[in-house]
């Protein structure tokens, strides 16, 4: 299966966890994809981030494609640059933050596959954090 990132519409998550999520490959959108979900996460410049979170049903491999930032995993903090990666096994808490002036683009691969309802949960958590729910 071949895909161009720009051909997929994303879902925008507003502040405080400002980013865009694009489901590029998933069992939810392609019957040929069975064992993983591939989401492109683009964190907004100057502070776009995720909250501290974990995925009980799946591990997450994060491959940092562009931009700079910081990642928290368990008791460690890592500087993010293009060409670095982080794996968070199922149930392990992690967070990413864009510390630069450019978008921070992350290829997020979930093994085993997760439901793309995950994106709706991320949007709801952002709304709750802003006090809008």
Regions inferred by a protein language model and the residue ranges of each:
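A short, N-terminal "cap"/entry segment at the start of jelly-roll beta-barrel domains
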Residues: 1-35, 51, 121-133
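A generic structural signal for short beta-strands and their flanking turns/coil linkers
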Residues: 20, 34-39, 60, 67, ...
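Conserved short histidine dyad/triad with adjacent acidic residue
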Residues: 23-27, 39-56
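Short, charged/polar surface micro-motifs in flexible loops or helix N-caps
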Residues: 30-31, 43-48, 68, 112-116
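Ligand-binding loop in jelly-roll beta-barrel domains
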Residues: 34, 90-116
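Short, conserved beta-strand element in jelly-roll/cupin
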Residues: 40-43, 54-71, 109-111
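Structural motif
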Residues: 68-70, 77, 93, 103
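Short acidic-glycine-tyrosine-enriched beta hairpin
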Residues: 75-90
């Amino acid at each position: 299966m071949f895909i161009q990132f720009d051909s997929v519409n994303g879902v925008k998550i507003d502040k405080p966890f400002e980013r865009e999520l694009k489901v590029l490959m998933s069992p939810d959108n392609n019957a040929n994809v069975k064992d993983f979900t591939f989401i492109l996460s683009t964190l907004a410049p100057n502070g776009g981030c995720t909250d501290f979170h974990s995925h009980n049903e799946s591990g997450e491999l994060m491959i940092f494609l562009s931009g700079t930032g910081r990642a928290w995993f368990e008791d460690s903090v890592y500087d993010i640059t293009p060409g670095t990666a982080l794996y968070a096994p199922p149930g392990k808490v992690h967070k990413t933050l864009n510390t630069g002036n450019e978008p921070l683009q992350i290829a997020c691969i979930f093994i085993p596959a997760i439901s793309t309802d995950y994106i709706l949960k991320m949007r709801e958590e952002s709304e709750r954090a802003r006090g809008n729910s």
